[in-house]
Structure formats: C-alpha cells, structure tokens
Regions:
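Residues located in well-ordered beta-strands
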Residues: 43, 55, 108-112
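C-terminal boundary and immediately downstream tail of ABC-type ATPase nucleotide-binding domains
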Residues: 49-74, 85, 152
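Short, conserved beta-turn/loop elements at beta-strand boundaries and strand-helix junctions
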Residues: 114-120
Length: 179
C-alpha cells in the first residue's frame, strides 16, 4: 500500500526501515548502511542477489554463518576464506524416500525444528555442527522433527577479506551444461 500511495502522489520519498521485507517491496533503490557507512546500493534485486560485502550478504533473511563451508559437497575452494553465508532458499531438503536430483552431492541432516509459516514450513536442520534454515512448500511431503533428511546446498556466499564470492554447487552447474 505504501508504494502505491507514493506512486499515486508522484513524490520522491526516502523511507528508513529495519524491516528487510518491507524495504524490498517498497524500494526502487536500496541503500544498506552499517554504522553510518554505506555498504551497498542498488535495486532490490541487485542488492539481494549480488551482495558486495559480508554485511550485505547477511542482511536479508535468516542467513546462516558457516565457518567451514567444505562440509558441503562440490563447491569451489577459495583459499583463505573466512566463512560462508547460506540463505534458506539456497537449501533444498528431501526426505530419504523421495526422488532427488542431486543425491550424490547431498548431505544427511537432522530436522531439529519444523515451524508452519502459512505458505511454507520453515525447517531448522543440523548437519554435524552446522545449523541451517530451509523452507519446504506445502505441496511437498511433510518432514517431522527428529527425521533424517538429505540436504543439498545449491549456492552460498563465501567471505574473504569482506569480499563476497557467490559460489554455485558444481553438481548443479554441470547439470545445466548437459545438452
């Protein structure tokens, strides 16, 4: 409603919010600040999909910070990487009896929590010492707390010296190359 009102009035507006979802919905341009310093600016899609700094990468959603991203299979090694950021939408979860596209590159995890969020289920998963959030649609078979599932991490942001490297799981990337 706010964006509609701004457009209807034909005014230029600066909207300050700490609600990331609201910022993405309303903005034509987003400026992410951290302690008075501009971290990144761009369209909502640019800022979300191509973060330029560690702060920008972890700003949206319920991103998990992973100290050793090598626990996930088939990602390029970035020597000297400090940590990785994994957003829930990067994580694909399948039950043990489900058909899965990337079974050889999936890892086993325990479902620690399942929360109904209206249009999806939010999962908290434990893979060794790593805790991840993931989403599962209402059209997918329900997973339960305590269940063992397969987890495929499709993408992650690796941080080295505040630079962000967006890495794709090579097993998924190679799948796209098949003709």
């Amino acid at each position: 409603w706010l964006k509609d009102m701004i457009e209807k009035l034909g005014i230029t507006s600066i909207f300050v919010t700490h609600d990331q979802d609201e910022a993405i919905e309303v903005a034509d341009e987003i400026i992410i600040t951290n302690r008075g310093h501009i971290e990144q600016k761009g369209s909502p899609v640019e800022v979300y999909q191509s973060p330029e700094t560690a702060f920008s990468a972890s700003f949206f959603g319920q991103a998990a910070t992973i100290r050793d991203y090598h626990v996930f299979n088939y990602f390029e090694d970035i020597p000297g990487a400090e940590y990785a950021i994994v957003r829930p939408e990067f994580v694909k979860v399948t039950r043990k009896n489900e058909v899965q596209k990337y079974k050889s590159s999936a890892s086993e995890a325990d479902v620690e929590r399942v929360a109904f969020r209206g249009s999806y289920f939010e999962l908290q998963l434990k893979l060794g010492e790593v805790v991840l959030s993931a989403r599962r649609g209402l059209d997918e078979p329900l997973v339960r707390q305590g269940e063992k599932v397969d987890v495929f991490v499709q993408r992650l942001f690796v941080i080295k010296e505040n630079k962000v490297y967006a890495l794709e799981n090579s097993s998924a990337r190679e799948d796209y190359l098949v003709i």
